[in-house]
Structure formats: structure tokens, C-alpha cells
Amino acid sequence: MSPLEIRTSSKAEQTVRGVCQDMARRLVSHPQGTCPVDVTRGLIALCRTQTCGKCVPCRIGLAQIESLLNGVLDGTATESDLSRIETLAENVRVSADCAIGTQAAEMALTGVRAFRDDYELHAEGRCVCTSDHPVPCVQGCPANVDIPGYIALVKAGRFDDAIELICKDNPFPSACAYVCEHPCENTCRRSFVDSAVNIRGLKRYACDHETPNRPTEVGEPTGKKVAVIGGGPGGLTAAYYLARMGHSVTVYEQRAKLGGMLRYGIPNYRLPKTLLDTEIAHITSLGVEVKLGVSVGKDIAIADLERDYDAVYVCIGAHSDKKLRIEGEDAPGVVPAVAMLREIGDGNVADLTGQDVVVVGGGNVAMDAARSARRMGAKSVKIVYRRRRADMTALPEEIDGAIEDGCELMELVAPAHVEVNDKGHAVALWGQPQMISTVRGGRPSPKAASKPEVRIPATTIIVAIGQNIDSAAFEEFGLPCKWNEIQAQPDSSIPEKPGFFTGGDCSWGPATVIRAIEGGKVAARAIDTYLGGAHEIRCDVEIPAPNLADRVPCGRVTMKERPGAERSCDFELCEIGMSEEEMLQEAGRCLGCDHFGYGAFKGGRSRAW
């Protein structure tokens, strides 16, 4: 018999591999609000089963750490035991022979140091975490929209009720149905079975089938006046809820139209502007006054707003571009992505027919710029990114969409300098090849590779490496600023300037649409409280009874798009919504966590805030 033979996995190995895959799905959809001590103990136990057991630190050290953590959870540990965990974990970290032991020890160290208060409470026999967690998808949504509720309503064909329920927490259901990054899906418990429910797709189905003219009740006038600086999603969200509470709201917007980055940062092929206009019209119909083309700090003094209004909400967007800081970046032909997208939002679509375009960046703005350039007639579009595709911050579907539109990815290339012709116009971008190096903060860092620079011909170079906030006027007025961001409390108030509130990009940096909506909602509550109000935003729509049928494994319905060769020639909508059959199947995949064991909705869901 030959000494070599083909090795096949045993049944036990195949079973263990399946269990590990199930565990991976559970870790990906890990909910918020769970006990950090229990999570740490579970991860240490998992790592201990993965070690080879040949070195003492892993074989004995991890077992001892797990035993000590069990004592913490049992309430039998003392303060000295917490110190023992820290000391033992440090010893394992520096002496383990493999990465499994080292990383397990680092997890234990991180836990006992970062959550020391939780460990001490456990030692006293108490735990601040309970089994009464919020529904994972609701907790994952920054605006805390009642997602299981509106999915049940969509499945029942009650689309207007679904939109009414969404608007209790988010006045932009249509905009989010088309462009939201859907963080709610990251914690969907359906991932335990197969894959997350397509929540955004179901929301879009409701928006596409609602009847026009959403009715909204407005409270009795309070006599209080509020100024909102910035007509983007955050500012309009605050205006919407403050108007519903009965306050008189005036929105100041420096552009010719409302919408902020929804209008001037997201192209029409992703979010049709007719839908955005309809949603904004609904908000302003509540009595919100709008002043367009007004730059606060230039056309009107901030002090005048302080004098004329009872409260002021500052919610300006990040409309300034970050610089590459390389030679030649100020040459004609080098344009900021935000400026280009802003021009498109104003209806000024440049003609790039026959041009070679290079886009620098790896975020959603870079993908929007690249895909827009293709629609503007560019002969070729190359996306240059200094890291790998896997490290890009853009949504995977946006990266796929750019490639299908005919854009080319150039990974691991960092901009070095811009080449110009004798007239000073950009003709090429030179890039320095990179290689992935050490991991910092959970993300691999690139470093220059020992390779010559590459020349990338380009008549237009679009820079999309991030945005800045222009907060100079507000800092001069006296609002506390750090790194161009206005500093505020978690409730959006500014203690240094009573009556002033802030949120959105200008408070925490460029973020997503749903984060801006969260900021506006939080600010509306804080402003109402500051003005002496105690108004509620309610929705008393009755949710259908839960379906008790089994949820068998079933594939996720994905949103289709028009063919790349067809859609890359125009700015018409790319994504195709679900059919009724697809909607019913996808809504039926929802596990109903608001009813079955997990959610805090048992005994009555939250109908007001």
C-alpha cells in the first residue's frame, strides 16, 4: 500500500466545520446590550477549544482565565480575582506560542480593563445587563425605527400604515429605502438561520406602494420659535418633529434647494430627486418656513438668530473636500468629488466624453463620483485606492455596481503626484504601489512597496478622500469647536451656549443619512424639553398578530439592477424594486423578534417618544 493517500474530512470534522460556520454567523449578528463579561468568557472558551494544547500558556492559562471569569459571573469573585485575571492574561499574552493564545489573552485584558465597572458589579453579585434586550434590528437602527412592526404591516399589505409607523422615528422613509446603509441588517437574527432579512428592500416596497399625501397631525402652537441652520436630512428631521410638536420652525439653507447631501451628494440614479422633493414637501407642509440662499454667519449674523429665536439647531453638512497634499493637486483638471456631485445636483452635468478619468478614494462618495463620470461620457474610469478592495469603506453593492458600470479598480496604489502639461493642466496621476503592513485599530495599514511609481493617464482627476466642515463662523461666535467639529452633549445641547444645539456632520464628522436623522430626532426632543415642552410623537397603528408558522431556511431576496451597459449611459434609477411575490417571501423570513422571546416589546411596544 502506498505511504501517501488522499485525505478526506471525517464526518466529525465536517460537523465541527458546520458548527464553526454557524458560530461565525452568530458573531456577525451579535446584538447590542449583552453582558460584556459573559461575552468575554464565551470567546475565551471558544479560543481554548481551538488551541493545539502544546504550550502551557494556552493549555493551562486560558483554562484558568475561563475559571476565574466563571467566578466573576457567579458572583463569587473578589477584587483580587480581577487583578489575577489581568496578571494571568498579561502573562499568557507575552508567553503563548501562537496567535490564538495571544489574541485570547488580549481579549481578556481588554475586557477587564475596558469594562472594569461591570466586572466589579458582578463581583458584588449584580449585573447591569438583563435578558430584556431591545429587538436587535431596532437597536441597530440609529433612529430606532420599529422595523418588525412595519415589516408585518408590509406583509399584510397595509403600506400607508407602515409608512406612518416609520415616520414616527424617521421622516425620510423613501430616501432611506433607496440609499440607507441598513445597519439594522447587521444585527438581524435571521443570520443565525441563513442571511439577514432585506429590510431596506421591504421598506422600499412600502414606499413604492403608499398612497400620496401622507396625513400628519400637528400639535397646538406653542408660541416658541426655533431656527434650524442647515436644510439637510438632519436639519429637516429636527424641523419635522418640532413642527409636529407645535413649535414655529424656520430653516436656513445656503443652497438653492433643500436636501443637503441627499440632493447634492447622492446622484439621481441612486435616489430620484422627484421622490426627495415629495418627501421634503411633506415636511414643509407642516408649516415649516424656509429661507433659501442664506449663508448663516455671512448673510445673517448668528447673534441675530440668538436674539430672534428661542432655540437654534446647528446642523450644517460636510461640504468641503480634504486635500491629497501632493504636488500638482491644485492644477486644472483636478476636482473635488463633493464639488462635482454638487454641480450634478444643481443640474449642471459636465461633458466628459472621451476623457480618461481617475477617482481617488474608496468610500461611497468615490463610487458615486466614478459611476457618475461614466454617465457623463468618460471613456475610461479608474478608481485608485491605497488599500485593498476588502478594506474599502464603500458598501459592497456600490463597489460591485461601479465595476458593472465599467469602472476599473486599482488597489494598493497611493497618489504620489499629478503630472501637468506645458499649459499646467493635469494629464496623469502618478501612484506609488503599496503593500499591506501592520494592523492598527483593526484595519491593515498600507506602506510603500519597493516598486517604481506607475503613471495613470488622466484628463480629469476626482478626489474623494473625505470631507471637512466649515465651522469657522460658529467658532468665532463662541460655540466650542475641536477639529472643525462643534462640541455638544449626547442630547445635542451645548452647555456653553444655552439655547444652542447641534448634530449631524458638524458635530461628529461626515456620517450616513440615518445617523443625521438620528441627530435631528435627538435634537428635537432636547429642544422641546429646553422650551418647557413635554410633547410626544405617537403612532397608534395596530400591528398584525404574529405568524406562528415555522421559518424554514430560505434564501434572501436581493435587489436587482438594470444591466450595466444600459444604465451607465443615463442618470435614471438603477435599482429595481421587489415584486409582490418577492416581498411576501422576504417579509415571511422575519423571525418576529418583537414577539418571540428576544425583544423588549413583550407586553407592549413603544408607541411614542
Regions found by a protein language model. Give the residues of each.
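Local cysteine-cluster metal-coordination motifs and their immediate loop/turn environment
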Residues: A45-S67, E90-M107, V128-G149, P171-F192, ...
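Glycine-rich dinucleotide-binding loop and its adjacent helix/turn
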Residues: Y205-G219, T278-K298, D321-M376, C481-K497
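Feature captures the FAD/FMN-dependent oxidoreductase FAD-binding
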Residues: E220-P221, K225-I229, D277-I326, H417-W430, ...
